[in-house]
From Swiss-Prot:
Origin species: Desulfosudis oleivorans (strain DSM 6200 / JCM 39069 / Hxd3) (Desulfococcus oleovorans)
Positions bound to Mg(2+) 2: 208, 244, 248
Lineage of the organism: Bacteria, Pseudomonadati, Thermodesulfobacteriota, Desulfobacteria, Desulfobacterales
Family: Belongs to the ketol-acid reductoisomerase family.
Name of the featured protein: Ketol-acid reductoisomerase (NAD(+))
Entry keyword Transcription: no
């Protein structure tokens, strides 16, 4: 396994050049891969596996919208598409790709279907790490493994189709067969991962929950809203406030940072922007550090898990969620955003 230097720290990384798709096919040649859940990660991983020549079946609540989506994607009821319990019985590798709350709901049925030597696969460590709250405690005679793509289901599929793939982390929680790591890496390669980073279930879930609530979404949304509100309070128009807060970030700067790094970005902007950004970055870092410390503590002690399971399991959850999302969508900031997005250069081209 090659090592790569990340900021002065040597880390092991599995590559698709070292562990080829051909090798993955050999490792998984006698496996039936059951994908439980056809919502977010399910379609991408299932279709990538199918396109790479692996035997895949889907387990989904019969007749719901996701069942119909699976049919539209080419899975056939009674052949490659089954109710959840039936699909779990047929598989040798059971991919638990339902929502976290969904996994808790179906676990008692899935557990009864597991056979000695099966592999129970996750793309998120939530159910296993917070077992005291989820009740997900696998039997000792199955492998318990994880491959967590570093991107949404949409990107897992999109990148696979354009040939680039997506990187993933992987972990083994329980090795009952002596083949758990080999199976895990093979499954990571099979869904299109070019590089696989070793982790643990615990580290994956702690970093993932912190990231989602932090920079990736929660902190990002909150910070953008705060700046937009300050600009509006001081008389800037909605379009100007949105452009200076969101549009320049998403359409220009973040792409350049992704390609070249933050040091390059600082070196390739106006001297006024450069000096100001360098001066203010530490202030923002120090201001939000206590919030991140608090967030990480809540993730680690299970407080965030308790909230997720309580709220997401409520009978009126979807109704309340729609109201929350509608409030955001109908806010001045994001209504301004919709108008600004319509004026992007690529949309002007479509009108001609």
């Amino acid at each position: 396994m090659p090592t790569i230097n990340f900021g002065g720290v040597e880390e092991n990384v599995v590559t698709s050049e070292e562990f080829t798709l051909k090798k993955a096919r050999e490792v998984l040649k006698n496996e039936v891969i059951t994908v439980l859940g056809y919502g977010v990660q399910g379609p991408a991983q299932a279709l990538n596996l199918k396109d790479n020549g692996f035997e895949v079946i889907i387990g989904q609540l019969e007749g719901d919208a996701y069942w119909e989506k699976a049919i539209a994607d080419g899975f056939v009821p009674g052949k490659t598409l089954f109710p959840i319990e039936e699909a779990a019985k047929k598989g040798t590798i059971i991919k638990m790709l339902l929502s976290d709350a969904g996994q808790v709901a179906v676990w008692p049925k899935v557990k009864k279907c597991l056979k000695k030597g099966d592999a129970l696969y996750f793309s998120h460590g939530f159910g296993i790490v917070y077992k005291d709250q989820t009740g997900i405690v696998p039997p000792k005679n199955v492998d318990v493994i994880l491959v967590a793509p570093k991107g949404s289901g949409t990107n897992v599929r999109r990148n696979f189709k354009d040939g680039s793939g997506i990187n993933s982390s992987y972990a083994v929680f329980q090795d009952a067969t002596g083949r758990a790591e080999e199976r895990t890496i093979a499954l990571g390669i099979a869904i299109g991962s070019g590089y696989l980073f070793p982790t643990t279930f615990e580290k994956e879930v702690f970093s993932d929950l912190t990231g989602e609530r932090g920079v990736l979404m929660g902190c990002l949304a909150g910070t953008m809203e705060a700046q937009y509100n300050v600009l509006r309070k001081h008389g800037h128009s909605p379009s100007e406030a949105f452009n200076e807060t969101v549009e320049e970030l998403t359409q220009s700067l973040i792409r350049l940072v992704a390609e070249n790094g933050m040091d390059w970005m600082f070196a390739n902007c106006s001297t006024t922007a450069q000096r100001g950004a360098l001066d203010w970055a530490p202030k923002f870092r120090d201001a939000v550090a206590p919030v991140f410390d608090s967030l990480y503590r809540r993730v680690k002690n299970g407080a965030e898990t308790r909230r997720v399971l309580k709220v997401n399991s409520a009978p009126n959850y979807l109704e309340k969620l729609r109201k929350e999302l509608d409030t955001i969508k109908n806010s001045e900031m994001w209504q301004a955003g919709a108008a600004v997005r319509a004026l992007r250069p690529e949309n002007r081209k479509k009108k001609k």
